[in-house]
Structures are given as C-alpha cells and as structure tokens.
UniProtKB/Swiss-Prot annotation:
Keywords: Methyltransferase, S-adenosyl-L-methionine, Transferase, tRNA processing. SUPFAM superfamilies: S-adenosyl-L-methionine-dependent methyltransferases. CDD domains: AdoMet_MTases. The keyword Transferase applies. This is tRNA/tmRNA (uracil-C(5))-methyltransferase. Dual-specificity methyltransferase that catalyzes the formation of 5-methyluridine at position 54 (m5U54) in all tRNAs, and that of position 341 (m5U341) in tmRNA (transfer-mRNA). InterPro entries: MeTrfase_TrmA_AS, MeTrfase_TrmA_CS, SAM-dependent_MTases_sf, TrmA_MeTrfase, U5_MeTrfase_fam. GO terms for cellular component: cytosol. Its EC number is 2.1.1.-, 2.1.1.35. Pfam families: tRNA_U5-meth_tr (PF05958). It comes from Salmonella schwarzengrund (strain CVM19633).
Length: 366
C-alpha cells in the first residue's frame, strides 16, 4: 500500500485476518464470532494531514514512509474523501504561485463531511499578517466560486486566524433519523464517517429496550451520547476538552434533544465525584443521585481504562465499550470479566489496509 494506491483487491483478505485476530484475542473472555462491519474500500477518510514540500518552483503534498522515513509525493489520496482529493489539487494551484500564501507554509490539514463541507488549515513557520489574510480571503472566494463549501484557517506559533469559522456541521443518517454534529478544527472527530454511522447504529441496536439512564465517559462532541439518547430516559456525559464540550452543547440544541446533560470533567474526576471522594463546583446544580444509570458507555483513548475507572464501571449492570485498541480492551477485560460477561462483540473496520482494529463489546453483569 502506498498513499496513492489502495490494494482494494486485498480488502476481503485483510478484513478476514482482522476478524480471526480479534476472535483469537477475545477467546479468553468470549467464544462469540465478531459481528463484522465493513468500510468502503476507498474514499473513507474524512480528514487528512500532509506536510508540504517546496521543490524549486514546484510545491506538493508529502507523507513519510513509516519504516524508511523517506519522503513520498502525494498528488492524490484515494483513502480520503472525494472532497479532500478535489481540495488537494485546488489548494496547490491556489498557493503555488502566491508568495504570501506559500512562504514558510509547511503543512495543510483537511477536515470534510459527508454533507460536503470542509475546513482547511494552513500551518506556517512565520508570523501571519494582513497580506496573508487578504491573500487567503481571495483564495477562499475563488474556491467557493468553484462550488466548494470551504473555510480557511491560518495557523502559526500562538496564532490562529479564522476567515469566518473553524467548524463544519456533519449530517449523518442514523437508524432512520438525521443527526447533526458540529465538528471543530483540531478537535477529535471520527475519521471514517461511513463506519461511524455503523458504530452508532450497532450501539443503538444493542441498547434497545434499555431501562433507566445512560452514563458516558469521554463523550467528545456527543457523537454517541446524542444518538443513544432515544434509547434512555436520560443521558449524563463527561468530556474534558473545552471545544468538544461547546460542540456537544451545540449538537444537543441542533438535534432538539432534551434528555442529555454534558459535564466538563475528566473521567477520573467524575469517578471521585461518584464515589463521594471530592466535591466539584462544576457539579453544582446536578444531583448525581437522581440518575439511575443502568448502562455505562466508554470509548476511552488507546491506553484504555485506568484502574480506578475499571472499578467504577463494574458497578453498572451493563457496560458498552468501544475500543480503538483491542490490546488494552483485553487488559481491561481481565478485570471486567470477573463481574461481567461479553454478550455482544463487533469489529468495525475503521482503518482498512492497516493493522488497526476498532471493536465494540457489550458486557452484562453476571
């Protein structure tokens, strides 16, 4: 696999290998055959980052080979959305011969949606001035004249210039309902939108007929919380990153959802609050005791759940766990399987043609 070539003819084989590997890893905890959710074989990534290489008068995107660290020119990137590929050509054409935009430019980041919106961030090793703003505004207007719904951002040390906004709004069809998600530049979003839809629909399916309330740790922009709200009386969710919390609050309003409460705090802090170890000003006005959370949802970072959070989640009858690292999931399951059994197992092929696996498990109390 190279950045400009995807071995689509090998997709079935690589997916089968992942299924077998996940099943083997999960064998100590479950004999279930994973439910498998396939990715589109190309144009599945909704975001991409490229370094820029200045080669005389020429200018082009590059990536680095992970093994050899050698430079690879990238003019097309079939793993990324069609919109990113269109923008890659348009950005090079618009920047190459413009000194204000090209000088000291070292990276371009692309974020796109299925609703055909884009934020493009240009990163510089220089101070950005009014000349840059005028040139960037002209480029943005030229891109929009080509029918591209794009927002440009300039970044340099301690500097961020938004020509108009730093977000785009995604619209996803999820189990018969359109969900609106504000996605903020430089904040986490699910990279594979088609796979995200399947993950949300799987989570909805395994939690149907739920009783009581849902607690979610690490909720991001509310991706899962808001989709799952229809299955629960109430949802209480935590997130630490300010931009993600702001996006989640917007998404609650945009989707006309009235049973989700977002709290800005770390999972570890929330564990302390739930256990009565500490009191937090951020929880004033929120009576944790009135929530009857029968289900807890966790989508932790690659490091998995810390030991205190492991203990905390064991108190819930059902644990829905989405993992971007099955190795740390299995490490957590060494503890969680003492009190819970794996009742559902799914593999989500979030990153085709790579070793990476995303998976989901539903755990029910013994």
């Amino acid at each position: 696999m190279t950045p400009e070539h995807l071995p689509t003819e090998q997709y079935e084989a690589q997916l089968a290998e992942k299924v077998a590997r996940l099943q083997s890893m999960m064998a100590p905890f479950s004999g279930l055959v994973p439910e498998v959710f396939r990715s589109p074989v190309s144009h599945y990534r909704m975001r991409a980052e490229f370094r820029l290489w200045h080669d005389g008068d020429d200018l082009y995107h590059i990536m680095f080979d992970q093994q050899t660290k050698s430079r690879i020119r990238v003019d097309t990137f079939p793993a990324a959305s069609q919109l990113i590929n269109t923008l890659m050509k348009a950005m090079i054409a618009g920047v190459r011969d413009n000194h204000a935009l090209r000088h000291k430019l070292f990276q371009i980041d692309y974020l796109t949606t299925l609703s055909n919106q884009a934020v493009v961030s240009l990163l510089y090793h220089k101070k950005l001035d009014e000349e840059w703003r005028e040139a960037a505004t002209a480029l943005r207007d030229a891109l929009r004249a080509q029918g591209l719904n794009v927002h440009l951002i300039g970044r340099a040390t301690k500097t961020k210039i938004e020509l108009d906004q730093d977000y785009i709004d995604e619209r996803l069809p999820v189990a018969g309902k359109e969900m609106i998600y504000r996605q903020v530049e430089n904040s986490f979003t699910q990279p594979n939108a088609a796979m995200n839809i399947q993950m949300l629909e799987w989570a909805l399916e395994v939690t149907k007929d739920s009783k009581g309330d849902l607690l979610e740790l690490y909720c991001g922009n509310g991706n899962f919380s808001l989709a799952l709200a229809r299955n629960f009386d109430r949802v209480l969710a935590t997130e630490i990153a300010k931009p993600s919390v702001a996006a989640a609050q917007y998404n609650i309003a945009a989707n006309h959802i009235d049973n989700v409460q977002i709290i800005r705090m770390a999972a570890e802090e929330f564990t302390q609050a739930m256990n009565g170890v500490r009191e937090f000003n951020r929880l004033q006005g929120i009576d944790l005791k009135r929530y009857q959370c029968e289900t807890i949802f966790v989508d932790p970072p690659r490091s998995g759940l810390d030991s205190e959070t492991e203990k905390m989640v064991q108190a819930y009858p059902r644990i829905l766990y989405i993992s971007c690292n099955p190795e740390t999931l299995c490490k957590n399951l060494e503890t969680l399987s003492q009190t819970h059994t794996v009742s559902r197992l799914a593999l989500f092929d979030q990153f085709p043609y790579t070793h990476h696996m995303e998976c989901g498990v539903l755990l029910t109390a013994r």
